Amino acid sequence: TKQMLDRFRMAVPAPYMPPANYRIVFPVKGDYQDFFRSAGRPNTDHKRFEAAIANVSLPIEEQDLKEAVRLFLRAYWEHQYENFAEVLLTFPMINRLVKYILEVNPEINQALRLSYGAVFLDEFQDTTLAQFSLIRTCFEGAGTRLTAVGDDKQKIMGWAGAMDRAFDVFTETFDAR
């Protein structure tokens, strides 16, 4: 997804378009707590907030969320973009930006679909909801042959938001055999 953002970053609508020199960060609990304090919400659970950032579609302003949640998530994005000379992005934010690019630029999405007649999804048991939503945006209804492989007994990324029933969801979504 990083490569897609780097290539198509200029197609991200304002105010979400990052500069070319954005920096990838890996926030820890303390980083989130610093933001929560500055936003006047010191008791926010950082794991739930991190999951919300990873799963919310852009633009946040158009999502069906409680107003307080929408404002809080938007404030985080603004905080990460605060110093435009050094925008701070996490990999989940990059995922959301790429999904947004594909949603608002059908020609880019079509070019992606035409580039890949087959897609192999390895270790699918560890796919997150955000990753799966990006796969759906890219390939649902495209006629691309998708192959998801993995082993539920080897699922190790539950702590990081890996989907429950990943293969069932894949089978239902893509009418897989």
What is each residue range found by the language model?
Residues 19-22, 116, 130, 142, ...:
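Residue-level signal for alpha-helical context at structural boundaries
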Residues 28-120, 129-134, 158, 164:
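Accessory N-terminal region flanking or inserted into the helicase ATPase core
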Residues 123:
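Catalytic glutamate of the conserved HExxH
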Residues 1-5, 17-29:
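Conserved beta-strand -> loop -> alpha-helix junction used to position metal-binding or nucleic-acid-contacting
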Residues 7, 80, 101-104, 137, ...:
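Active-site catalytic microenvironments for nucleophilic, acid-base chemistry
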Residues 14, 134-177:
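Conserved RecA-like helicase ATPase core segment
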Residues 1-14, 110:
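P-loop NTPase Walker
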